[in-house]
């Protein structure tokens, strides 16, 4: 998620610069096509331009946008790869696609780098959680480029301290409702990937796991301990949905509705990605957050750019953040078991070299440049995408941009990954269909149904619901 966005003029300039560079004659005319999601085009284009300058003309990296939606991105890449598209070089892959692209032979293992440098570069100075998402069957097929983790966001003016467990979340919401105060727990619970992320985090935090490490066996109910973890995760989801004063629209919620529920004064607790902080500050500066009137703060005048996006100076960001702490704060994601840290499901992108690339040596070198420490700093500080390089979390510039840096680093070190399997899309779809609507969850029955449905996905049986 972005914390800061480049203006339209800057975006146009960057796109033009990238296109012009790609038409040049550097490296004997070698162009490495770099496919990334469209919603972060400005950041990825800017970093490609930086690499073109750093590479000294030996070859050129050209950013090309994939669709905004993850499913459409995957479909386009799959079609290009199965069609043997030789213009495909470097691919930005969602963290859940590694197994599928590796198993299909679409992504080259990093050990295939002709220079022999890819594995060491991907491994050194990279956080453990993101690195795990780039592996399949203990082999690296990609190098992490961006990552993300959810935190707990809460109204500091409504409680003395944030809850540390989900049982505590429900108890706090119940107390607030009884006092006539905002009491919703904002989550992502409609039938989509966000619901799978929530369930996976609860399950892993309870000591469970969807699949065995080889991705072939469903492990939700195979042992007494695993069944207990699955049932506990489902009990929490049902409790959040049915708590006194719960969000009546909870079965239709996603990241956006969760953010708005807090900004509109309806939710006191929220689990969501770090983008909610800059969003809260931006809307408060615009006068859209009644309990945080930053539009009345003179030192924030001019912090909105020509298109109405919050683009503060460092001093303005600090002033806005300090003011917000009176009513809005963040804390580690709530755990399931008392005294134990949550294992939060991470998001992000990994860079892989396509099997169809005609310039493998240059493609692997491009990845090393795109994720070097300086370009990672730019991606994080200017682009608002959390870094995968461990050393950046000690960087004062990064820390100023990410006040939550210590929590983010800790959670990314002990992160949960989504089930690793070449048929992840089928598994994910069956999980979300079985869980929705969460108001109808019967923990024991739903645990058994999840096991049946996910095994069907693994076995390739039947149509996806």
Q: At which residue positions do the language-model features occur?
A:
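Conserved N-terminal structural module of periplasmic/extracytoplasmic solute-binding proteins
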Residues: 2-99, 116-119, 295, 299, ...
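Short helix-initiation/N-cap motifs at beta->coil->alpha
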Residues: 65-77, 96, 167-168, 249-263
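A structural signal for short loop-to-beta-strand junctions that line the ligand-binding cleft
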Residues: 78-80, 87-89, 119-156, 334-344, ...
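Short, solvent-exposed loop/beta-turn-alpha elements that line the ligand-binding surface or hinge
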Residues: 111-125, 189, 208-232, 282-285, ...
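Glycine-centered hinge/linker elements that transmit conformational signals in sensory
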Residues: 172-173, 216-251, 333
């Amino acid at each position: 998620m972005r914390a800061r966005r480049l203006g339209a003029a800057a975006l146009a300039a960057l796109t033009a610069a990238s296109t012009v560079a790609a038409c040049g004659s550097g490296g004997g005319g070698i162009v490495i096509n770099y496919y990334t999601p469209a919603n972060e085009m400005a950041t990825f284009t800017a970093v490609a331009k930086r690499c073109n300058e750093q590479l000294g003309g030996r070859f050129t990296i050209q950013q090309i946008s994939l669709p905004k939606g993850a499913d459409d991105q995957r479909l386009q890449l799959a079609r290009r790869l199965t069609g043997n598209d030789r213009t495909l070089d470097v691919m930005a892959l969602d963290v859940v696609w590694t197994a599928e692209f590796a198993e299909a032979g679409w992504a080259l293992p990093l050990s295939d780098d002709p220079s022999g440098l890819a594995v060491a570069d991907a491994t050194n100075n990279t956080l453990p959680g993101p690195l795990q998402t780039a592996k399949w069957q203990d082999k690296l097929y990609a190098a992490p480029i961006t990552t993300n983790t959810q935190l707990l966001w809460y109204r500091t003016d409504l409680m003395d301290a944030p809850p540390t467990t989900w049982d505590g979340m429900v108890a706090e919401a119940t107390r607030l409702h009884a006092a006539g105060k905002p009491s919703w727990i904002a989550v992502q619970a409609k039938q989509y990937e966000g619901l799978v992320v929530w369930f996976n985090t609860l399950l892993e935090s309870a000591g469970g796991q969807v699949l065995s490490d080889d991705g072939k066996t469903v492990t939700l109910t195979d042992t007494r301990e695993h069944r207990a973890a699955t049932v506990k995760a489902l009990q929490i989801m049902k409790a959040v949905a049915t708590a006194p004063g719960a969000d009546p629209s909870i079965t239709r919620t996603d990241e956006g509705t969760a953010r708005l529920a807090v900004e509109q004064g309806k939710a006191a607790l929220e689990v969501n990605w770090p983008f909610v902080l800059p969003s809260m500050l931006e809307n408060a500066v615009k006068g859209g957050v009644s309990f945080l009137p930053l539009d009345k703060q003179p030192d924030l005048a001019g912090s909105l750019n020509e298109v109405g996006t919050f683009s503060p100076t460092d001093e303005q960001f600090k002033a806005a953040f300090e003011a917000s702490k009176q009513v809005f704060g963040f804390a580690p994601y709530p755990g399931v078991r008392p005294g134990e840290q949550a294992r939060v499901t991470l998001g992000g992108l990994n860079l892989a070299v396509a099997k169809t690339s005609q310039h493998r040596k240059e493609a692997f070198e491009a990845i090393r440049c795109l994720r070097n420490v300086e370009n990672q700093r730019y991606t994080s500080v200017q682009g608002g995408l959390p870094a995968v390089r461990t050393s950046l979390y000690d960087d004062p510039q990064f820390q100023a941009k990410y006040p939550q840096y210590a929590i983010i680093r800790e959670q990314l070190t002990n992160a949960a990954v989504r089930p690793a399997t070449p048929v992840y899309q089928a598994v994910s779809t069956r999980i979300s269909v079985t869980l929705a609507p969460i108001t109808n969850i019967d923990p024991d029955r739903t645990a058994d149904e999840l096991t049946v449905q996910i095994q069907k996905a693994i076995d390739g049986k039947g149509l996806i619901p």
